[in-house]
Regions:
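Juxtamembrane intracellular "pre-TM" segments in multi-pass secondary transporters
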Residues: 1-4, 181-221
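C-terminal transmembrane bundle of multi-pass solute transporters/carriers
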Residues: 7-13, 45-49, 55-59, 66, ...
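Conserved MFS/SLC helix-loop-helix module at the cytosolic interface between two early adjacent transmembrane helices
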Residues: 54-92
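C-terminal ends and interior cores of transmembrane alpha-helices
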Residues: 79-93, 300-313
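Cytoplasmic helix-loop-helix junction between adjacent transmembrane helices
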Residues: 102-140
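Symmetry-related core transmembrane helices of the 12-TM Major Facilitator Superfamily/SLC fold
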Residues: 160-178, 384-399
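Helix-loop junctions on the cytosolic side of multi-pass membrane transporters
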Residues: 165, 173-192, 399-410
Length: 410
């Protein structure tokens, strides 16, 4: 069967990723808090199960992708993550939530690194930055489509979004098997593969790339801080809204939390689409210095937004800075991906990208339970303030990379 061109497949995959993610996770906090009965610590521990799986398997799956096939790694990832989503919807049990999250993290490692490396090799380093931004926009459009579907399903049964989201991902894995090309990647020839020795050689080459680059070493520190802060925000921000505020009526119309979170997620996507379009127009993604300056501003804004969200006693101000945070954070992903791919040789690209993901996962494993415990024993507000403080070094570190890149080829 004839394969499709790489860019349309990449963009469709990003759309499906956004669709299924928002379909499932628009109302997942309500499912976990109200149906499963999870508290702040359990919410974070579920995320920690995911991050432990990512930490354990991120680099091994990246190495396998560099040795054998990025295409195979990606389609396996869609199959496994689809199964994982379906598991959580089987019954409202904390044990199933943890199992689902661990399997989701395992499946994610097959996509992380490999998918980005695949499209970079297919279209080239200079073209891929703009494609990452377009891909992010397609993810957001998919998310926009997923929100009303998820809300409607959740109104009938809170478990239904998990089941449908999982089925869509598994089906898309079959589509990738049939139509996803792989023409830009050259695997290690079978005759040159020597079992575990090939794995260790690929890993060693990836480590050497990072160790020889002061830019990548500094970025590794940023990845750690990003991991340390993010679990508190991802798991506790919406729970903080439920804990602190009574959700108001709009124009005399009473809305339950499900409807409110649907509206909020729609706003997140609309503003994120706008921020990505602005970045696409203003940031020259072929020039690393431009990307770095943008990332410095993005992370400074994120820190400020988290702090204001945590201390605000106003529902509408909290919503406004939450939307701002989500919009600028959305830009950080494709810009980081574009810059990082510019620094890495093709033969170890998936491995090094997976190392960055592993550092992020390690940060989430270390920071998540600690901040979750703070949220349980003190307050979600305290946990979120600590999260902002943890992220605060990121912007100065991006400034440092800008200075270093004048001495080291970027």
């Amino acid at each position: 069967m004839k394969k499709l061109n790489a860019p349309p497949v990449y963009l469709l995959a990003m759309f499906i990723a956004g669709l299924t993610t928002k379909l499932v996770f628009t109302t997942h906090i309500i499912y976990r808090v109200q149906l499963v009965g999870m508290d702040a610590l359990q919410l974070v521990l579920a995320g920690t199960a995911l991050e432990i799986a990512v930490f354990l398997f991120e680099v091994p799956t990246g190495i396998v992708a560099d040795i054998y096939s990025r295409r195979l790694s990606t389609l396996l990832g869609f199959f496994i993550t689809g199964i994982a989503l379906g598991i959580e919807g089987l019954a409202p049990l904390f044990s199933l939530v943890v199992l689902s999250q661990a399997l989701l993290g395992f499946g994610f490692t097959f996509i992380s690194g490999a998918f980005s490396a695949w499209i970079t090799d297919e279209v080239g380093v200079r073209r891929v930055g703009e494609l990452f931004l377009r891909g992010r926009q397609l993810t957001l459009l998919g998310s926009l489509a997923g929100i009303p579907i998820g809300v409607m399903l959740a109104e009938s049964a809170l478990a239904l979004p998990f089941i449908l989201g999982g089925l869509i991902r598994v089906t898309f894995g079959i589509f990738l098997f049939l139509f996803m090309p792989e023409t830009g990647f050259t695997p290690i020839p079978k005759a040159a593969r020597t079992g575990w020795k090939t794995v260790f050689v690929t890993f060693s080459e990836g480590v050497a790339v990072v160790r020889k680059s002061s830019l990548l070493l500094t970025f590794a520190l940023i990845a750690l801080f990003v991991g340390l802060y993010s679990e508190a925000w991802d798991r506790l921000a919406q729970a903080h809204l439920l804990e602190i505020f009574v959700f108001p009526a709009i124009g005399g119309l009473e809305l339950d939390p499900i409807a409110w979170f649907g509206l909020l997620n729609t706003a997140f996507i609309v503003f994120s689409l706008a921020s990505n379009e602005i970045a696409k127009r203003l940031v020259d993604t072929a020039r690393s210095q431009r990307i770095l300056r943008a990332l410095e501003s993005v992370y400074a804004t994120m820190v400020l937004a988290i702090f204001i969200f945590a201390v605000s006693g106003s529902f509408y101000l909290s919503i406004a800075v939450m939307i701002l945070f989500d919009a600028v954070r959305s830009v950080s992903f494709p810009l980081t991906e574009a810059w990082l791919n510019q620094q890495i040789k093709s033969n170890v690209r998936a491995t090094v990208l997976s190392m960055a993901g592993q550092l992020d996962a390690f940060g989430e494993i270390a920071g998540g339970p600690a901040l979750g415990a703070v949220g349980r024993w003190f307050s979600t507000q305290t946990a979120l303030i600590m999260s902002a403080l943890i992220l605060s070094p990121a912007a100065p570190l991006y400034r440092r990379i800008q200075r270093l890149s004048g001495k080291e080829k970027a």
